[in-house]
Swiss-Prot record:
Annotated ranges, domain Lon proteolytic: 627-808
GO terms of biological process kind: cellular response to heat; protein quality control for misfolded or incompletely synthesized proteins
Tree of life domain: Bacteria
Region (Disordered): 1-22, 805-843
Reactions the enzyme catalyzes: Hydrolysis of proteins in presence of ATP
Keyword Protease appears in the UniProt entry: yes
Keyword Isomerase attached: no
GO molecular function: ATP binding; ATP hydrolysis activity; ATP-dependent peptidase activity; sequence-specific DNA binding; serine-type endopeptidase activity
Record gene name: lon
Protein name: Lon protease
Family: Belongs to the peptidase S16 family.
Length: 843
């Protein structure tokens, strides 16, 4: 426990005397002890934050076990002790190196027990001594000492002059300190021994411990008095200047300034007493952090102004917490710290290839950036946006880019964000205000040039609180983001060195201005072969590690893997594929844990094992079954998951020419169906369909998966093909899928999402795909492996579509002859039975 020092003065005399204040017990010379009465070995009492002089009286509170044992022995044996100041006050168990070499012989004149392990005592200084060596460390310190005797002539003229000057200076200092009582002057005047006078003044003047110790170590009287004169003179000048400043400031001091002044005085007193509070230490630490943060000049000016204001605010005030938190944010943000880019192109290529299979266009763009960055050091960070279905590796690709460039990676999820303040932050006037997510992410990154991923940027919302996508315009604008302004900081922050990467499943929901600021890079769905490669080289090893299985524990055959991909997943990415592989790993883990197979045994997974572990197949190729009757065609649709096949069913029934559409269709798709029907009616004669087929017939077109909304013009050719198949009785080929917009003249117009639609058809086992002729160029984006396994028909007119899609070309067929009315039959003619109509087939 730390010893606590007080003074031996009365309450009035204590005020303003400072730490470790000591007074003489009498007016005459100090209490002396004969040199021969001082033992050669003394118990040593270490003293903190004070220097004890001969002739002084000092009360102490002790609690350390070593000190208590020392005091008890000294009182019992009526022996003197040695009081020596510690070099470092925080040292709890000082040794020889932690103590000064000159101390004061003292006698314990009073001892009181204050508690179980606390004592209060009063010691009286007798003489100086010098520590020669420590001879004992337990149970307390003992040292071999040498008494130091001052043999100076007291009645020397120079000594007398020095004493007069000392008393004069002491009176001036006391007058400059009105808080001291008048008795202080009387005490100084009453002391006649010059050595005692010098020691008393040195003990009570407010100077550093090191300078007081220097006075104690100065044995020769004249030198000691001159040293004290120098200390006292410096103290007088400081007090004069302080009083002058006080007089100038107090005249215009407001309540806040007065409070600041008092707190500064309190801080100085606490420092002198060794009781500096945590708040002051924290503020000093905060100031040091701000110095090391490398702040720009304008930011440093604001921070210093706020810090000065903080020092004048009471710690109990809520404003103190607000200002302190604000400065913490400024100190914690990276202003100049950056990570060096790894510009090794081959190393970056190797990292990207190791982490991701395929995605050549994305990898090429990243390597281009690194190449330009290598040639031009001050290049701004690119702003990319990866658009693709779930599970194709958009987020993990951002992590790989950070690893390849050697930068920090931070991810900012924007899904569901509707408040503009989430991006820009709240102003400090609000309770609990914080910076926006951009600044929070920069603090987390701790560098000015991280890779920052803006995940799910297409799922930003907007409401009465503002539009977050509009706030992102400044963030993602290379011409503005060097001075991004967060509402909380209210300072310019440079984001120009950040590499921003956005991710989205859909491009359409992203506002135009925001889309314009980003370089769009589309990630296609994986082909069948790519999924097999990814599973074998990435997913299976990863799941084996996560399930505690050795690399040789499972051998999933390629046939089994194909079965999992074809029968249990139907996706553009590989997320569900990874889940199914995890299911297999868990099944093997159960067998290993239950002892059915050895931990080192290798388990082979075949197709039959897949069925046993994963259960019934969830997906199967149904195009042949669905299109085995006339009136059903297979279309291609674009979805957020990357693309899918879409069956369109048409049927007819007796009626008056009504057209019914079902399947949660949007207006555009309904209009496409109406346009297809109009074209069919205009060309019915050339397709072998009766001209008046709608007079007594109703048509119903249905799009299965009725719970899912559908819209868009690209189903036009599929609707028309299904209607032609229905009305002619010619089936659509089961291995054909199609997409395209149809006009009233039968032209096939280009549509979007070709890459996703082609990959969806490839996954579903389609062999022939009919697409608009003007979409031929879009096949360059389709992976080469998929292009090789598919047959493409590029159609510019519906005649080409029908010729490629139907099992028999209906173009040019003649419609069946209409039967003669019964009333016009010739007498005696034999009635001919009507031929079987092809449109009698029902779905």
């Amino acid at each position: 426990m730390r010893e606590r020092k007080e003074t031996a003065m009365s309450d009035k005399e204590k005020k303003g005397a400072g730490a470790g204040a000591q007074v003489a017990p009498a007016m005459g010379p100090p209490v002396l002890i004969n040199k021969e009465d001082i033992p050669a070995v003394l118990p040593i009492l270490p003293l903190r934050n004070s220097v004890f002089f001969p002739g002084g009286v000092l009360p102490l509170a002790v609690g350390r076990q070593k000190t208590i044992a020392l005091i008890k022995d000294a009182v019992r044996d009526e022996q003197v002790i040695g009081v020596v100041t510690q070099r470092r006050a925080e040292e709890e168990d000082p040794g020889a190196a932690d103590l000064y070499t000159v101390g004061t012989v003292a006698r314990v004149v009073k001892l009181l027990k204050m508690g179980e392990d606390n004592y209060s005592l009063v010691v009286q200084g007798l003489a100086r001594f010098k520590v020669l060596e420590l001879v004992q460390e337990s149970p307390y310190l003992k040292a071999r000492i040498e008494a130091v005797e001052d043999r100076s002539v007291v009645d020397d003229v120079e000594v007398e002059a020095l004493a007069i000057n000392l008393k004069k200076l002491a009176r001036e200092v006391i007058e400059l300190m009105p808080e001291l009582p008048a008795a202080a002057t009387e005490l100084v005047e009453s002391i006649t021994h010059p050595g005692h006078l010098a020691d008393l003044i040195a003990a009570n003047v407010d100077v550093p411990i090191e300078e007081k110790q220097q006075v104690l170590e100065t044995v020769e009287l004249k030198a000691r008095m001159k040293l004290v004169l120098e200390l006292l003179n410096r103290k007088r000048e400081i007090l004069k200047l302080s009083n002058k400043i006080d007089s100038a400031v107090k005249g215009e001091m407001s309540k806040t300034q007065r409070e600041y002044y008092l707190r500064q005085q309190l801080k100085a007193i606490k420092e002198e007493l060794g009781e500096l509070g945590e708040e002051e230490e924290e503020l000093d630490e905060l100031q040091e952090r701000l110095k090391k943060a490398g702040l720009p000049p304008e930011v440093e000016k604001v921070a210093q102004k706020e810090l000065n204001r903080l020092k004048s605010i009471p710690t109990a005030s809520s404003e103190y917490t607000v200002a302190r938190t604000y400065l913490d944010w400024i100190a914690d943000l990276p202003w100049t710290k950056r990570t060096d880019d790894n510009l090794d192109i081959e190393n970056a290529r190797q990292i990207l290839d190791t982490d991701h299979y395929g995605l050549d266009k994305i990898k090429k763009r990243i390597l281009e950036y690194l190449a330009v960055r290598k040639l031009k050091n001050d290049m701004r960070g690119p702003i990319l946006c990866f658009v693709g279905p779930p599970g194709v590796g958009k987020t993990s690709l951002g992590q790989s880019i950070a690893r390849a460039t050697g930068r920090k990676f931070v991810r900012l999820s924007l899904g569901g964000v509707r408040d503009e303040a989430e991006i820009r932050g709240h102003r400090r006037t609000y309770v609990g205000a914080l910076p926006g997510r951009i600044i929070q992410s920069m603090k987390k990154a701790a560098t000015v040039n991280p890779v920052m991923m803006l995940d799910e940027i297409d799922k930003l919302g907007a409401d009465f609180r503002g539009d977050p996508s509009a706030a992102l315009l400044e963030v993602l604008d290379p011409e503005q983001n060097h001075a991004f302004s967060d509402h909380y900081l209210d300072l310019s922050y440079d984001l120009s060195k950040v590499m921003f990467i956005g991710t989205a499943n859909l491009l359409d929901p992203i506002p135009g201005p925001l889309k314009d600021r980003m370089e769009i890079l589309e990630l296609p769905g994986y082909t069948f072969e790519e999924k097999v490669h990814i599973a074998q080289n990435h997913l299976i090893p990863k799941q084996l590690r996560e399930h505690g299985l050795s690399a040789d524990a499972i051998a999933i055959s390629e046939k089994a893997l194909i079965k999992i991909i074809m029968a249990y997943t139907r996706e553009a990415g590989v997320r569900n594929l990874e889940r199914r592989i995890a299911d297999v790993c868990r099944a093997i883990a159960v067998e290993v844990a239950s002892g059915k197979i050895g931990a080192s045994a290798k388990r082979s997974i075949e197709e039959a094992d897949v069925l046993e572990i994963l259960g019934p197949e969830k997906f199967y190729n149904e195009t042949a079954e669905r299109t085995e009757i006339a009136g059903v065609a297979t279309g291609l649709a674009w979805t957020a998951a990357g693309g899918d096949i879409l069956f369109i069913e048409a049927t007819k029934m007796p009626g008056k020419g009504a057209l019914t559409l079902t399947g949660q269709l949007g207006d555009v798709m309904k209009e496409s169906a109406q346009a297809a029907l109009s074209y069919l009616r205009s060309k019915s004669d050339s397709l072998g369909i009766p001209v008046n087929f709608l007079e007594k017939t109703d048509l119903h077109i249905h799009f299965p998966a009725g719970a899912i909304p559908k819209d868009g013009p690209s189903a036009g050719v599929t609707i028309l093909t299904a209607l032609v198949s229905l009305l002619t009785g010619i089936r659509v080929r089961s291995d054909v899928a199609m997409t395209g917009e149809v006009t009233l003249r039968g032209l096939v117009l280009p549509v979007g999402g070709i890459k996703e639609k082609v990959l969806a058809a490839h996954r579903a086992g389609i062999k022939r795909i009919i697409i608009p002729a003007r979409n031929e160029k879009d096949l360059l984006d389709v992976p080469e492996q998929a292009r090789k396994e598919l047959e493409f028909v590029f159609a510019a007119h519906m005649d080409e579509v029908l010729q490629a899609a139907l099992e028999e070309n209906p173009v040019g067929r003649k419609p069946p002859a209409a039967p003669e009315p019964e009333g016009e039959k010739k007498p005696g003619a034999t009635p001919t039975p009507p031929a079987k109509k092809p449109d009698e087939i029902r779905v």
